[in-house]
């Protein structure tokens, strides 16, 4: 029988796995309990990661101890309002686009925040921070109040949230965001999306992760239905996704929060990250179509040079930022600077823009980075004494449509 049967609301009460055989689910649906058997189970349970936790595959990524707090707000100011334009003329003329219908990011030392307009005029505002670098207030009132107080240490947050009120029924906190599964598939089960792993919401990599993992899951299932041998396919699937997760984390995210609030370092990394993303994964998918989604990022040998390049400049920028932190020199190049760039496209000419970013990296190394050449990279320190207020006027605001 073709098609799909949707049960809603429903919850999984029990899972019985039989690799190579039929998998059995016990479901609670309304007032009834139902048992369903199938050759394959696809776990798309998100952060609940039902199968990874049940099988003991779930692991916390201790190298990336981020946390997040967020809420829905009323009364957030309009980024494009006449009030702000008259009060801050340079702010109003900095961009040609409309900020208020875009997702805006306000960034500081060890943290970043999102500002997402919602239907009806409300705004989702939240922060993500590295717990080794930022001490988020824990015992100073309601979570929404603490979130507002934290953001109001930044001049943009202070202006935008001056008259805003959080929705008390829609305030959230999540600790230790990053995790992964040590196994991504077996003969009869496959994990997709956040059920397989999560790194960081910055750059929204979850959209890529679900695209690659769901496409590869569908290919596994159809291969089995065609009668193909599964052992090597499943082994390769697990190998590819484990390598992809680790490479994605090490290249883009490991210790990135160390330099996130440094305009020169972060704006250079942003250009390189974005340009290489279009030059690599995006162009690959446009070239090969759906087949390009069957192999996750950084799992092919030809992608390893790009991985090493991205990991290298990310490590270097983190090390330079640590040296600045020790010298109490964070944010010294930030005042009056903003990172506003045209987006990349698939045009070959856009790849030339990468040379400018690479030249900027070289300049940073020659003028400052050389002081840490040959030094062993240090681990990110425990929570810094540098607060959001200390670098409030020396942080970067980024907005994109």
Show where each model-derived region lies.
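Intrinsically disordered, low-complexity regions enriched in Ser/Pro/Gly/Gln/His and often acidic
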Residues: 66, 72, 107, 166, ...
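Predominantly flavin-linked oxidoreductase catalytic cores and closely associated redox partners
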Residues: 2-157
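Short, surface-exposed, charge-dense and proline/glycine-enriched linear segments
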Residues: 36-37, 41, 90-101, 188-198, ...
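A general structural signal for short secondary-structure boundary/capping elements
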Residues: 86-92, 161-163, 173-174, 236-238, ...
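Alpha-helix boundary/capping detector
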Residues: 67-68, 77-78, 177, 263-267
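FAD/FMN-dependent oxidoreductases across multiple families
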Residues: 109-113, 117, 131-220, 224-253
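C-terminal helical "tail/cap" subdomain of flavin- and related membrane-associated enzymes
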Residues: 220-396, 400
